[in-house]
Amino acid sequence: RTLEWNWRGETLRLGADASGSGPKVLLLPALSSISSRREMHPLQERLAPRCSTLAVDWPGFGDAARPQMDWTPDAYTAFVAFLLNSVVEQPHAIIAAGHAATYVLKHMADASPPTPQLVLIAPTWRGPLPTMLGGHRPFFDRLCRLVDRPGIGPLIYRLNVNRLAVRYMGAGHVYADPAFLAGERLREKLAVVRAPGARFASVRFVTGRLDPLASRATFLDLARRAAAPVLLIYGAETPPKSRAEMEALAAVPGVRTVRLPKGKLSVHEEFPDATMQAIAPFLTEEKPSAATG
């Protein structure tokens, strides 16, 4: 299945996979250089007997060709609204990973009931370089402009997403077991980073230009304002700086939390059984009839 979405005069065609029957569940992968809707397939398979699921690629990401655009948080905020207003109206639940979780949380902070149940998997609000360096730096913008340029841009990008770099990134931040990213799975990830036009959204994510928020305080405030039940899931092996943000979110009253004994930023992909065991009881609960906060 392909979704069509118009953004600033350009029609974008985005990959989407549907499966199962029952209450509607929208699954949104992380925003990252190697992410696509396929990372949600293990959860889709486990949800299919009880739910009608749809997993969707983000604009600028996935394994298809992508146009050159100056991607911004406004685009992703608008895309979430498009999905919930025109594609999966009034879903029973939304399962979202990484930055996707925070974009959904941002949307729900101002939503009116009825609201879906929110499953936030290893949620992040700050890109890799700002996380590593403790904030934004002037050279981030220069790097984006450089990667956008023909000729040198693709060269710089390829040097940073070659096979060795992707495996190193996976072992360092994404997967608990370095051997998990091998064989067909590695080929799928390489297809994502090598898709025509992949560099434009990727470099903006890495440099923090797709960050939906500017501070932890705003991140936590969204959770307090969300008029929806929230379940937070993350792995104990999540990199410390990202884990600190998740632990702060876990301390917000009303946020239910499951910390899995294993797993990093893609815990749902690597440990789908444990993730599903955490999600299943939450999805079967009766939803409140009115906003709770």
PLM feature spans:
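Flexible "cap/lid" loop of the alpha/beta hydrolase fold
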Residues: T115-I152
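Short glycine-enriched nucleophile-adjacent loop
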Residues: A101-S112, L118
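Catalytic histidine-centered segment of alpha/beta-hydrolase-like enzymes
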Residues: G263-M276
